[in-house]
Structure formats: structure tokens, C-alpha cells
């Protein structure tokens, strides 16, 4: 029986969360075309007769001096210190850039075993030649490279085999039926945030967060009251929408997803609140990103 921890690293929107959800077979990490949707270290657990893999999905690696981004980068570095293996995922639709150089530098300095995953091989018009040349120049051995499609589950079985090859004998860290260790409040707040991101302009998702005010199980149904906080007054109108159209859409789609995941009826009530410049408050950022 083998077991261990594997961190998923990569630039924003490379398919890290999709890979986590695909292999674990459940919606664990929220997904959006908006870069850096993932803020926290999200654990996904895969168990079979060979052992157990605990994946840690990390925020997208992005070089920026904004407080929020710096906090997320600290998250990535702390994740690396917790694992036996790093899965570095590259979107083959994009040319290698400054982030690729920095990520490989961090990985090599860590002395931790790693695999490079070339994701989205099911798509056309890729930069596979440029990426292959880049990895060759960085002296990455072919044995450490796997071509995959996280969405289409291409070569994910080969990936699991490779991961187990890099793990040592060990116990199961979680019961077999577990697929994540996230608390229900966090999962629900992330689902609401995901649905808000799907509706809104690109710049707005970075200025909102969700807090669960009330979460109760009443006669077999979830009763949830949640607050969506924004950083300035104008953003409230964007989220609420004309005659409440946007917030109603966010709430309805979040309710459907919550009911499906937790296999129960769900009553969800959302309210939009202003917390001016919250994304510049160190204490709040630290609480939200962990």
C-alpha cells in the first residue's frame, strides 16, 4: 500500500482544478476561465487498491506585487513543503513565459521529485513544439513528462501510475470514502463564489468574497444564508443586476449545484454587502487565503 501528497502547480487557467476534480471523481475545486479562481490550498483525495493520493490544488502562479497575489504565492510555497511529489501542469496552448522559468527554478531548488504535465492535448493549434524545446533546454527528462487532457481524462491512468511509482509504502491518511477534507461552510462559499464569477466582469471576481452567515440542516434540507462582500459601492449594482436579475441567477445556479453535491434539498438566501477595500486588509486576506 502506497500513499503520499502531490502538489499541483502551474500558471493560472492551466487546468489544475480540472485535473483534481477529474481524477478524484467529484467537484472539489471550483473552475472558471477567469485566472486565479483558486485562492486556497484545496485537497482532493483519491483512493484505490494501490493506496492513496492526496492532491493539493494551488493558486495559479502569477508574478505580481499586489497583496492578494503575494498571499497566494506564499500558499504555493507552503504547499511545496508538504508534499513528496510536484505535478507541474502546463497549458500547451500558451508559449512558455517568465512564470515557467520561475516555477521550474522553485521546483529544482526544492529537491522534490516532480512530473511535468502537458495539458489539453485534445485541442488543436498548440505550442507543443515551443514547450518541448523549452523543457529540453531546461534539461527535463522525457521520463518526467506526460501528455494529458484533464478534461477528457486522456492519460490520467498513466499519470496515477507514475504518481504511485514516486510514492513510498505508507498508511491511508484518510478513510477510503473521503474525497476531500474541506469543511462544508468552505465548500458552499466556494460554490457561490464560482457562480458569481461566471456571471460577472473579469475585474470583479478579485474584489469579492463569500461568508456563510447561517448554515442549518432543517428536516433534511440545507438552510443557507450567505453574504457576498464587495470592495466598493459600484460593484454591488453589478452583482445585484437590474431588478435583481444577476443575484437571482447566481443564487439559483448555486442552489442547484449545492443540492446536487450534497444530495439534499437546499434553501439559499444571498445578500450583497459592502466592505470597502477589503482586498487590502492583511488580516482578512490571511483569513481568506490559507
From Swiss-Prot:
Annotated segments matching region G2: 36-40
Residues covered by region (G1): 10-17
Location of region: G3: 57-60
Any one GO molecular function term: GTP binding
Entry membrane topology: Peripheral membrane protein
Domain of life: Bacteria
Stored InterPro entries: G_ERA_dom (IPR030388), GTP-bd (IPR006073), GTPase_Era-like (IPR005662), KH_dom-like_a/b (IPR015946), KH_dom_type_2 (IPR004044), KH_sf_prok-type (IPR009019), P-loop_NTPase (IPR027417), Small_GTP-bd (IPR005225)
Gene Ontology CC terms, in alphabetical order: cytosol; plasma membrane
Region (G4): 119-122
Region span, G5: 148-150
Residue numbers binding GTP: 10-17, 57-61, 119-122
Alphabetical list of PROSITE patterns matching this protein: G_ERA, KH_TYPE_2
Keywords: Cell inner membrane, Cell membrane, Cytoplasm, GTP-binding, Membrane, Nucleotide-binding, Ribosome biogenesis, RNA-binding, rRNA-binding
GO biological process: ribosomal small subunit assembly
Compartments in which it is found: Cytoplasm; Cell inner membrane
Function: An essential GTPase that binds both GDP and GTP, with rapid nucleotide exchange. Plays a role in 16S rRNA processing and 30S ribosomal subunit biogenesis and possibly also in cell cycle regulation and energy metabolism.
NCBIfam families reported for this sequence: era (TIGR00436), PRK00089.1 (NF000908), small_GTP (TIGR00231)
Record family assignment: Belongs to the TRAFAC class TrmE-Era-EngA-EngB-Septin-like GTPase superfamily. Era GTPase family.
Protein name: GTPase Era
Organism: Borrelia garinii subsp. bavariensis (strain ATCC BAA-2496 / DSM 23469 / PBi) (Borreliella bavariensis)
Source species taxonomy: Bacteria, Pseudomonadati, Spirochaetota, Spirochaetia, Spirochaetales
Recorded name of the encoding gene: era
